């Protein structure tokens, strides 16, 4: 059965514009690709709009899928993932090897029940060494209205800042 990965293959590491302000994030992303679920889990990338977060997240997914087509990869925006409990449950039941969630700061706009469901999803993946990659417009400690137990988990792996590519 073919799963919709949500990936756009135009986003690759090869066409990611590397500079001083994003070298660490790229290096961490490549380490995740090579050590899926074992290194920097979760990988949390933050930066302002236009800094290349989505490009880097998509490149991770594309490279994992290219290297290991049998791996189950899902890229999804936080808005789509967190729109209701059923979507979270659907993603949880799919047993992805790599879950990439873009714009996780949206979690702060959701009620405790949705945050609880995401907490459970995160834990169910992490305990099985499934890789989680998150992006946000701010570092974990600056997330507004996100439960502290989630913020703690977001910092378990590697946190990397991207500076704008402009």
Language-model regions: role of each:
Residues 3-26:
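Dynamic helix-loop-helix/coil hinge segments at AAA+ ATPase domain boundaries and subdomain interfaces
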Residues 25, 63-98, 107:
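AAA+/P-loop NTPase substrate/partner-engagement loops
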Residues 37-58:
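Walker A/P-loop nucleotide-binding motif
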Residues 75-76, 131-137:
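Structural recognition of the conserved hydrophobic beta-strand(s) that form the central parallel beta-sheet
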Residues 102-104, 137:
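Walker B catalytic acidic pair
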Residues 105-128, 147-148:
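Conserved Walker B catalytic segment
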Residues 140-156:
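Short regulatory helix/loop adjacent to the ATP-binding pocket of P-loop NTPases
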Residues 157-166:
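Conserved AAA+ ATPase "SRH/arginine-finger" region at the nucleotide-binding site
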């Amino acid at each position: 059965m073919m799963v919709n990965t949500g990936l756009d293959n135009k986003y690759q590491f090869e066409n990611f514009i590397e500079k001083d302000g994003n070298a660490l994030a790229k290096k961490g992303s490549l380490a995740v690709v090579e050590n899926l679920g074992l290194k920097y889990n979760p990988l949390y990338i933050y930066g302002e709009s236009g800094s290349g977060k989505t490009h880097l997240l998509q490149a991770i997914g594309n490279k994992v899928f290219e290297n290991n087509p049998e791996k189950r990869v899902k890229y999804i925006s936080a808005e789509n993932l967190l729109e209701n409990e059923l979507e979270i449950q659907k993603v949880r039941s799919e047993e992805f090897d790599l879950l990439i969630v873009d714009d996780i700061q949206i979690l702060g706009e959701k009620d405790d029940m949705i945050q609880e469901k995401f907490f459970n999803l995160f834990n169910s993946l992490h305990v099985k060494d499934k890789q989680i990659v998150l992006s946000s417009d701010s570092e974990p400690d600056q997330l507004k209205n996100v439960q502290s137990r989630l913020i703690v988990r977001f910092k378990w792996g590697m946190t990397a800042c991207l500076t704008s590519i402009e």
